[in-house]
């Protein structure tokens, strides 16, 4: 067939076969990138907790525009950890406690699943709040992971506030009564010598000394390692050097029984130990 001009007539209708095929490939590629896939959101009943306590809430999983095979839903506590490597130091986010909430299941398009949970907080979890104020340098969050088969994982992160145990408050109160002031806190990878420790890191809370101790102490670092029955307390003192001597660190540790913690005058005990430490080479109590 030819047109009036003599040129062959070209059919303007496209062959949709290749176009449909390209669309399917593009759609699969977008699904693999997570576009149009499921979403996840965690709702905490209360973001405040204590070491050895728990967090409660639920995870909402919402289906996307296509059916999705979910491998599992899990939650975990994450914090920022300082790592020393040779002569360098860097920080990284580390998950230190994890709980799976589901096994595998198929999530239909537009479907909504609500998964309740009760998450145990490890005893050695670093504290992030003191007297209603955030501890400078600390980060803590509950991360939620939705593992998607053959696609990009989905996640959510919610801030968590970890408050001190009553026994920890006793020690903190004593230091503040002695005039020590909070400087900052961080979490360091490693283990503290001579204590029972499960997690691969420990928290250091740093204090400025008051005038009464400033002549012998540059800085005080406090570490708590709680267990179900006893609070392990570790002190590190950065001692000032003298006219003919160099400064150095002194260490000490002691245990606090939860049942009898409120029967001890910790301000008096700490004052005695701190003054003795400033006058001798080592500190062992």
Residue ranges and their predicted role:
Residues 2, 15-16:
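Short terminal hydrophobic/aromatic SLiMs and anchors at protein ends
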Residues 2-8:
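Extreme N-terminal basic, low-complexity initiation segments
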Residues 7, 13, 19-285:
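Terminal, compositionally biased non-globular sequences in eukaryotic proteins
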């Amino acid at each position: 067939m030819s047109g009036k001009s003599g040129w062959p007539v070209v059919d303007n209708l496209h062959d949709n076969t290749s176009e449909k095929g390209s669309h399917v490939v593009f759609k699969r590629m977008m699904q693999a990138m997570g576009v149009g896939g499921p979403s996840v959101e965690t709702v905490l009943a209360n973001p405040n907790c204590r070491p050895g306590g728990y967090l409660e809430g639920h995870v909402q999983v919402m289906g996307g525009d296509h059916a999705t095979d979910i491998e599992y839903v899990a939650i975990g506590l994450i914090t920022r950890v300082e790592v020393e490597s040779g002569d360098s130091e860097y920080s990284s986010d580390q998950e230190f406690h994890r709980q799976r909430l589901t096994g595998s299941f198929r999530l239909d398009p537009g479907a909504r699943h609500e998964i309740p949970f009760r998450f145990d907080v490890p005893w050695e979890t670093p504290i992030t709040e003191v007297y209603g104020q955030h501890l400078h340098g600390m980060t803590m969050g509950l991360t939620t992971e939705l593992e998607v088969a053959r696609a990009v994982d989905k996640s959510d992160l919610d801030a968590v506030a970890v408050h001190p145990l009553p026994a920890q408050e006793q020690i903190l109160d004593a230091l503040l009564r002695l005039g020590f002031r909070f400087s900052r806190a961080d979490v360091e990878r490693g283990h503290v010598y001579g204590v029972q420790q499960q997690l691969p890191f420990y928290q250091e809370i740093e204090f400025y000394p008051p005038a009464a101790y400033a002549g012998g102490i540059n800085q005080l670092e406090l570490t708590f390692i709680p267990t179900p029955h006893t609070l392990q307390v570790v002190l590190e003192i950065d001692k000032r050097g003298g006219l003919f001597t160099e400064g150095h660190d002194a260490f000490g540790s002691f245990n606090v029984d939860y049942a009898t913690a409120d029967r001890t005058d910790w301000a008096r005990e700490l004052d005695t130990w701190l003054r003795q430490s400033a006058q001798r080479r080592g500190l062992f109590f």
